[in-house]
């Protein structure tokens, strides 16, 4: 493999994959470095809008990927007694971007589609198990030193430019001495993803439960997938919150344990933050490496 590329991208998630597709379409040589060996199989991101679908059309995956999506019908905000505070239906018409205004998706489906599409570009190369150790940002090129997580072999590649799409704990951001500025929002929420094994009369749109004791969100996702998110109370025990007993007690108004399986359970700290510098010389950051925002 050639060890010099137009652009090296660190991180093969949605941001890195989309950027690689745009650059490869422009006939640039791209090297993708990804720390993980395999695609992460569980739900994460679940929503995008018409502007994003327009980008997917640009990179040539819209027709393939739309079969893995559903149109998001909108959101209702209800109080703790179930009274509707706000009904926000999404328009059913195609927008000026030529797409519907809101979509639901399963992130692993998207990553499979975009990775398969990138295989058609001869100038695109990817390396898995690549744990980046050092980024050297010089006047004429960028040098990346990474270690294979299985063989422990050290590798060095160079490029004209480098973009770090390597998440909130970005080594790329640290390499350019960029720091996050906290914009004042920090909350812990549990995110519970489930797969229904029985037909249930659940809402066909997003519901925001505006309960001051425990705000929560319900998402109607693709296929049989459903998601509930709820805020943790101050000093609440995180391990206890993620036990099946606690989860099924929370879900009791909507589901019984024999009606679905828990696919994923995790606690996120939702933050609002922005990096004070997105570029230094030939090195850039993008996605969560550059900014963090709550999901709603």
Spans of model-derived segments:
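Helical element adjacent to the flavin cofactor pocket in flavoenzyme catalytic cores
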Residues: 105-128, 132, 150
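A conserved short coil-to-beta-strand element within the FAD-binding core of flavoproteins
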Residues: 128-142
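Active-site-adjacent segment of FAD-dependent monooxygenases/related oxidoreductases
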Residues: 44, 49-117, 219-221
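Conserved FAD-binding catalytic core of PHBH/FMO-like flavoproteins
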Residues: 116, 161-271, 275, 279
């Amino acid at each position: 493999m050639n060890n010099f590329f137009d652009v090296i991208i660190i991180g093969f998630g949605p941001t890195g994959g989309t950027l690689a597709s745009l650059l490869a379409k422009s006939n640039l040589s791209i090297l993708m470095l990804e720390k993980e060996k395999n695609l992460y199989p569980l739900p994460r991101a679940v929503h995008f809008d018409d502007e994003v679908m327009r980008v997917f059309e640009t990179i040539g995956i819209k027709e393939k990927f739309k079969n893995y999506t559903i149109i998001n019908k909108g959101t209702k905000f209800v109080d703790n007694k179930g009274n509707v505070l706000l009904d926000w239906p999404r328009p059913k018409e195609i927008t000026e971007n030529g797409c519907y205004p809101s979509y639901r998706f399963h992130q692993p489906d998207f990553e499979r589609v975009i990775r398969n599409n990138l295989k058609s570009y001869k100038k695109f190369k990817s390396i898995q198990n690549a744990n980046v150790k050092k980024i050297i940002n010089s006047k004429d090129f960028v040098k990346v030193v990474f270690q294979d997580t299985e063989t422990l072999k050290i590798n060095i590649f160079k490029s004209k430019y480098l973009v770090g799409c390597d998440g909130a704990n970005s080594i790329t951001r640290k390499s350019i001495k960029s720091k996050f500025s906290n914009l004042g929002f920090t909350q812990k929420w549990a995110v519970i993803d489930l797969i229904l094994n029985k037909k249930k009369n659940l809402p066909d749109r997003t519901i925001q439960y505006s309960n001051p004791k425990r705000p929560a969100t319900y998402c109607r996702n693709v296929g049989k997938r459903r998601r509930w998110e709820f805020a943790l109370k101050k000093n609440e025990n995180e391990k206890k919150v993620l036990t099946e007993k606690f989860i099924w007690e929370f879900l009791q108004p909507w589901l019984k344990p024999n009606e679905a399986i828990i696919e994923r359970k995790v606690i996120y700290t939702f933050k609002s933050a922005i990096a004070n510098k997105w570029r230094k010389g030939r090195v850039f950051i993008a996605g969560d490496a550059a900014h963090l925002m709550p999901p709603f």
